[in-house]
């Protein structure tokens, strides 16, 4: 058992101060998991599973058919070399190592190398601007930064003079500018990797490792706030190891040495850290790296190679898979489409029966068996035929999306967590309510704070996975984690009779109308999306207003490289319009706006939005869809009265979506303020 560093509080806002651990929690699981540092956890796993495959990545022209596989034993060797490399360029204890790169094996090597050297890991989204990168490195007191390529190195060149603690920048992949490996402080990963390090440096590494304690900070996760610069969430070694073991214990059907994962979501996000980096260590799972264009269309290629057994994705990832499947289905013959529709209905019916705790009839089982033979080739086509568990989280998942995949024998189990809880605190594994976030993981205590007459209130949680604090922000830390250990999530929810957590929305997103009605927007937004399959994004407006309105964007294709929305409509939008006897295939034709908005030009997008004159049939159909959604409103105050169309789909590239593909509500409000004001005149 790792000795703990003396601490006086359960909270900390400094990289140099440890925290007390809640080892006396009533959970029996918590008492069976001793505190452990991440290097100890890593070493234990690598030695236990030394001959099993750990990491796989594409290396065109080399390896086995263009792919390289690393065993856990080799993984451990690479991490030791990375730790020595970081020491050689001056990484300081209790400083951070910034990692500004797309998912790749070197990300993992740098992470565990930094931790072994007594440093803290601070991931940076590759999409961040130079100023946003500066914020992470300055806040995190970085002494070393690892960057992906020349494009990311250019950001560091622009800001390095303003980072006096930053001693070294290491570039992972070429091509390299002339200054790399020649100017002081700039290195290539390859050259450092080729070095042989002295026995003195190796002794220094062991000495540093021996000083690490489980109750010290191991990682900084920067929350993607909508107001101001992101806050740095401090996670301890114990936070991350405990959350990993808690999630693993909650999952079913784990087969040691036979699990396969695909790493494609940003590793600067806590969900990817737990699912990609740490879960594989807990039961010898093999991680295959997708390329940097995974979310722009190449992910299926990696799935076909890796055949993952467990998958985690934000809803937008599953929406992209759905789009591919819908487009492929549209090209099939009418008889094939009819057969597939009936098969999907039979599979969904069978799954729904099981979730309700009922036993299917003999006829139902036979129908399901036959239907599975029809949908299996589709699962094979997208590389998920071996996948037994599908998790989604990070944003609300629509009922329509869940039903679509349920028909393919894919039950999307929602999970719930935050950066501040070190990852997942609930997992919907043994699904009894498809529309819930499942039940609390082992060692987690949940409660609903000040519930209303429907049992709904703020979700609170406590346990060893509650974060240390926000770096340098004691007031914000005290607002979030109270002295009694309860973390106030800011999320609204309730617990159903079966113990499942149902998420209603965010307290901060709660709309309070001029009449004083409290309205969580997500539920209403999802109802409208269900009624209008042509719509990609819905944003409810109404705070301090007399009535509710919505901004809507229609589904269009996007540029595979830049992620910028295109003028061409998606196949499902075209089909929906065809039923209205509208035959346009481009958004500009449909809304009578310019075809090239020069995105991400906000000025042009706003001007086009203000001048939209859409087809009357389209406006009528949208109005009817909103009326259908309004039938489910629990009061007149929750009915949507007006809507406005936006001139392009929301995206990360144009700023309306954050890195985890959540709508950035404040930004959309500001960008389209003139459009919103027109809805209230």
UniProtKB/Swiss-Prot annotation:
Role this protein plays: Mediates activation of long-chain fatty acids for both synthesis of cellular lipids, and degradation via beta-oxidation. Probably by regulating lipid storage and catabolism, plays a role in neuronal function.
Binding site for ATP: 223-231, 414-419, 491, 506, 639
Keyword ATP-binding: yes
InterPro entries named in the record: AMP-dep_synth/lig_dom, ANL_N_sf
UniProt EC number: 6.2.1.3
Traits of the deletion mutant: Results in neurodegeneration in the central nervous system including degeneration of lamina and retina, defects in the fenestrated basement membrane, ommatidial disarray, locomotor defects and shortened lifespan. The phenotype is exacerbated in constant light conditions and improves in total darkness. Effects are probably due to elevated levels of very long chain fatty acids (VLCFAs). Feeding the fly mutant with medium-chain fatty acids, blocks the accumulation of excess VLCFAs as well as development of the pathology.
Keywords: ATP-binding, Fatty acid metabolism, Ligase, Lipid metabolism, Nucleotide-binding
Cited SUPFAM superfamilies: Acetyl-CoA synthetase-like
Protein name: Long-chain-fatty-acid--CoA ligase heimdall
Gene symbol of the encoding locus: hll
Enzyme class: ligase
Molecular function GO terms recorded: ATP binding; long-chain fatty acid-CoA ligase activity
Lineage, top ranks: Eukaryota, Metazoa, Ecdysozoa, Arthropoda, Hexapoda
């Amino acid at each position: 058992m790792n000795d703990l560093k003396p601490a006086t509080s359960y909270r900390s806002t400094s990289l140099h101060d440890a925290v007390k651990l809640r080892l006396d929690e009533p959970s029996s699981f918590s008492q069976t998991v001793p505190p452990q540092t991440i290097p100890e956890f890593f070493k234990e796993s690598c030695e236990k599973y030394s001959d099993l495959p750990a990491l796989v990545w594409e290396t065109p022209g080399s390896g086995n058919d263009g792919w390289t596989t690393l065993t856990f034993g080799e993984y451990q060797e690479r991490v030791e070399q990375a730790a020595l490399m970081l020491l050689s360029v001056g990484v300081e204890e209790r400083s951070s190592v910034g990692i500004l790169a797309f998912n790749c094996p070197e990300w993992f090597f740098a992470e565990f190398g930094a931790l072994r050297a007594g440093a803290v890991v601070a991931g940076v989204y590759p999409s961040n601007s130079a100023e946003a990168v500066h914020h992470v490195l300055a806040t995190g007191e970085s002494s070393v930064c690892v960057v992906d390529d020349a494009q990311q190195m250019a950001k560091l060149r622009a800001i390095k003079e303003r980072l006096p603690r930053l001693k070294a920048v290491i570039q992972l992949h070429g091509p390299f500018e002339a200054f790399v490996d020649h100017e002081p402080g700039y290195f290539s990963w390859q050259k450092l990797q080729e070095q042989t390090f002295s026995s003195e440096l190796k002794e220094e590494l062991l000495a540093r490792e021996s000083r690490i304690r489980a109750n010290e900070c191991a990682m900084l996760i920067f929350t993607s706030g909508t107001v101001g610069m992101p806050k740095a969430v401090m996670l301890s070694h114990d936070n991350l190891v405990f959350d990993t073991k808690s999630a693993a214990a909650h999952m079913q059907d784990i087969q040691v040495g036979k699990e396969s994962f695909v790493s494609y979501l940003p590793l600067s996000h806590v969900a990817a850290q737990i699912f990609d980096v740490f879960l594989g260590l807990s039961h010898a799972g093999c991680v295959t790296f997708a390329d940097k264009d995974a979310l722009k269309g190449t992910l299926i290629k990696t799935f076909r190679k890796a055949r993952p057994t467990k998958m985690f994705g934000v809803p937008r990832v599953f929406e992209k898979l759905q789009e591919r499947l819908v487009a492929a289905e549209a090209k099939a013959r009418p008889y094939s489409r009819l057969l597939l529709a009936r098969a999907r209905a039979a599979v969904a019916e069978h799954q729904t029966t099981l979730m309700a705790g009922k036993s299917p009839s003999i006829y139902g089982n036979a129908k399901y068996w036959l239907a599975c033979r029809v949908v299996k080739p589709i699962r094979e086509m997208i590389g998920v035929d071996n996948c037994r568990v599908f998790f989604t989280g990070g944003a609300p998942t629509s009922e329509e999306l869940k039903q679509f995949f349920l028909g393919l024998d894919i039950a999307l189990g929602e999970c719930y967590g935050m950066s501040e809880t070190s990852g997942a605190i609930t997992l919907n594994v043994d699904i009894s309510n498809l529309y819930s976030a499942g039940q609390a993981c082992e060692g987690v205590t949940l409660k609903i704070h000040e519930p209303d007459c429907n049992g709904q209130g703020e979700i609170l949680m406590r346990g060893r996975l509650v974060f240390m604090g926000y770096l340098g922000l004691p007031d914000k830390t005290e607002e979030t984690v109270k002295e009694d250990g309860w973390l106030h999530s800011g999320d609204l929810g309730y617990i159903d009779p079966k113990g499942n957590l149902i998420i209603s929305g965010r307290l901060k997103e709660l709309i309070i109308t001029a009449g004083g009605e409290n309205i969580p927007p997500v539920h209403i937004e999802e109802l409208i999306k269900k009624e209008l399959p042509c719509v990609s994004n819905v944003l409810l407006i109404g705070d301090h207003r007399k009535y509710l309105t919505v901004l809507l964007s229609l589904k269009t294709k996007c540029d595979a490289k830049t992620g910028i929305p295109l003028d061409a409509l998606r196949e499902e939008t075209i089909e929906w319009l065809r039923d209205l006897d509208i035959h346009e295939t481009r958004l500009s034709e449909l809304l009578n706006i310019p075809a090239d908005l020069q995105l991400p030009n906000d000025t042009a997008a706003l001007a086009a939005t203000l001048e939209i004159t859409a087809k009357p049939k389209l406006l009528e159909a949208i109005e009817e869809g909103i009326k259908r959604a309004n039938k489910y409103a629990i009061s007149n105050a929750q009915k949507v009265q007006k809507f406005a169309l936006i001139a392009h789909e929301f995206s990360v590239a144009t700023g309306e979506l954050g890195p985890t593909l959540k709508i950035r509500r404040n930004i959309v409000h500001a960008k389209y303020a003139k459009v919103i004001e027109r809805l209230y005149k």
